[in-house]
Amino acid sequence: MAYTSKLIEEAINEISALPGIGKKTALRLVLFLLKSNPEQTERLATSLHKLRSQIQYCQKCHNISDTTLCSICANPHRDTGLICVVENIQDVIAIENTAQYKGIYHVLGGLISPVEGIGPEQLYIEHLVQRVQQEQPQEIIFALSTTIEGDTTTFYITKKLKEFPVKLSNIARGVAVGSELEYTDEMTLARSIKERILYH
């Protein structure tokens, strides 16, 4: 694509580097921003700057947060006896959108994948073991993707937790095999959590 402005070209290149956005969509966004009220563009720029400079990760569960503890871990009304283990932050958002789960979370930061060179030591698995030891929850719910990587990660963690008197369960397989949690519709996800099965 040929552009009449170097600044527009630079903006398009940066925006199109975002996932799911091609050059044409980036061009539409750039032209929209140029036509927008200057204050709106400034608010967007300020918001993006704050996002990079102020967002942190919850010290307890590794969810994104504005403070050292995320709003879920800091909420006294959440059931701390239930810890839902998820792959990433998108999964926390997906489960929260069901409005059915009232426990807390533990974000692993990925899944065990020898093919991609990701081992247990690169994930927040040891921290989960520490939490179980210190917090003594009643149940750990595995809400990981129904993939080989998800099953491998679940199996590895259950072996690490077998010495603790905690119930281990999997969300029901209403979530299609091979699918990622964040793309599962809210009704199916809510039912999968409600109808979770004990891990054997």
UniProtKB/Swiss-Prot annotation:
InterPro entries per the UniProt record, alphabetical: DNA_Rcmb_RecR, Rcmb_RecR, Rcmb_RecR_Znf, TOPRIM_dom, TOPRIM_RecR
Function recorded in the entry: May play a role in DNA repair. It seems to be involved in an RecBC-independent recombinational process of DNA repair. It may act with RecF and RecO.
Gene Ontology biological process terms from the UniProt entry: DNA recombination; DNA repair
PANTHER family xref list: RECOMBINATION PROTEIN RECR (PTHR30446:SF0)
Family of the protein in this entry: Belongs to the RecR family.
Keywords, ordered alphabetically: DNA damage, DNA recombination, DNA repair, Metal-binding, Zinc, Zinc-finger
Domain of life, per lineage: Bacteria
Protein's UniProt name: Recombination protein RecR
CDD domains in the cross-refs: TOPRIM_recR
Domain Toprim: 81-176
Pfam families assigned: RecR_C, RecR_HhH, RecR_ZnF, Toprim_4
ZnF (C4-type) intervals: 58-73
Molecular function as annotated in GO: DNA binding; zinc ion binding
